[in-house]
Amino acid sequence: DIDHPDIEEFIKWKVTEEQKVASIVTGSKICSNHLKSIMSACHNCEADGESCFEPSKNPALKREIIAARRNEVPENYIQRIIHFAKPGYKSVEFETYNTDWDSEAYVTVSGQNSNNSVRVTDEFLDAVMNDKEWNLVNRTDGSINKTVNAKELWDQVGYSAWACADPGIQFHTTINDWHTCPESGEIRASNPCSEYM
């Protein structure tokens, strides 16, 4: 319900989770590329022995470390690869991910097996049209938890639906105005796509 006290977090939930996927995919590829370059710089150097693993004595290694740091590769991974290269290891496995909906990246985030909807009332839509405040109401005692701008809340719904296709909208007032058996009680939910409405 659009007046639920947790509605803002609910609206943004899947957007945030999909942003995590983008971060996992991008971060894995950035780390993989830089770590391989650091490993290569350790072994393809003109210095002798241990000097190949010291950035002050191996200019190529220094360049690769600087490039990795610029791209936010964690320092512990940079150092780990250098230590891994010292005993002679020449390659490293660093798994990368993709944005396929059935990929490991999507499996690691929440909300991907849900189809979320927000139920909006005519009262809320009027508040949006008239740029009014909207109360988010506690479910346990009916008290006002927070007051937000209705138009801004509606904009959050629109942005989230654009960014990740959720939440869908269920028009609570209209659904119940068209209820074919109102004696059975108010319709409070449907499948998120609302084919049955």
Which positions does each model-derived feature cover?
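Active-site cavity-forming subdomains of large catalytic enzyme subunits
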Residues: D1-M197
